[in-house]
Amino acid sequence: VLLLGSGWQNKFCLEDTICAGAIADQLLSSNNFISESDSSVAAKYLYKSARDNYFGYLKASSHRKRLKKLNLNRDIKYCLTPNQTNVVPTREDNYLILSTS
């Protein structure tokens, strides 16, 4: 499994890393996956620091500030709420599609 955050304008995004940390934490706790990379360790630490209050934790992030200026606080809160959908995209022939299984 490769987790790749999209970032913003070719730059690191804190919320992408926290999301990757949440996914990595779930996968690794299943004991079906292993990781020996420092990036997954760092992402998991960020996730565990933020998981009790994503909205507050990301208050200083550049992306949240940008979206707040666009009056999108409600959207931000929705995006920071885990397990909002059961749809999982998959990659097929260089396209993202909805999983059929």
Q: Where are each of the predicted segments found?
A:
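Short, structured patches in soluble enzyme cores that scaffold and shape functional sites
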Residues: 3-7
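Short gly/pro/ser/thr-enriched loop/turn and capping motifs at secondary-structure boundaries
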Residues: 9-11
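Long, charged alpha-helical interface segments
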Residues: 14-101
